[in-house]
């Protein structure tokens, strides 16, 4: 049993090592690195607790003995120290977020925020949420499930303050889930910490479903997102929302779709049968999105993403169909009329290279007449915001500030 314990200890040591040195260069290894890195990093104290419980079990049965037992125990102790250091180091996100917002919006941006909105800002992470990361319901938030929209049986969920008034004219936040355009659901946990937080701040938050590949083929995904915008503009007033102020957000594939939606208002190929409908939004907050399907600048170190796109999403090769892939890429829709953006990316994302987000934000700043904030989080893995953690709490607070700033500019203009 000492050998078994040592093998388990080596696994724990690799999990800690993976936080600092994730795999980037091989498609399957990068996915494995993400699958272990996300929970180990963002739920670090929980992981340490459960690992300690397994070590306690081995101690009870006398398996931690001899050279192998001592070596295994030392590996576990070192791993826990490394995980704890990584976890608490993520508090740097507080400064990273504010720095990114100040660079993009201006150092005095918080003074431009409506006083009533500014008074709602939280400064300290919600420790209860962090202790119970899988608790998705909030007693102060009303959840309305499975509202139908669009032409293909799509559904969306609505979160709003439980005390909201029907004619409240609340600003709207639309969340688009990720999942490599092939899996994921509107209610699988993605974006819920942010949506619950903003609903308690007087926003209507919507999470919408869209057709997935391989049964769906691009542009089905973005068409469904556009139809969600049309429904919001035509139907959200009945729920107390303001159809004239919509911010769109999402992570990974949702980061791609939210960016593309924000940059392609009126693009007829994405609005078949409703070409004349208004699908404009007032801002976008993409997390770790994919912005260039052609990878023109060679940011991806392997062909894993290209294979997903060719085999499942487009069902055609990139070579010979470059224009199709470009049309689906937010990068090639950037113009001077792009709305305000807040782009969020981790440096240790093993699925989406940080360089791609840097390039996208740079191009947006060069071409758009609106503000662009870019927030880069040291050490953050892909999908870091799925769980309430120290890092995701500070990022959530930063997103709230961006949303409040954008909404304040809107209120000044009406």
Task: Say what each PLM segment does.
Residues 1-414:
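Alpha/beta-hydrolase superfamily serine-hydrolase fold, recognizing
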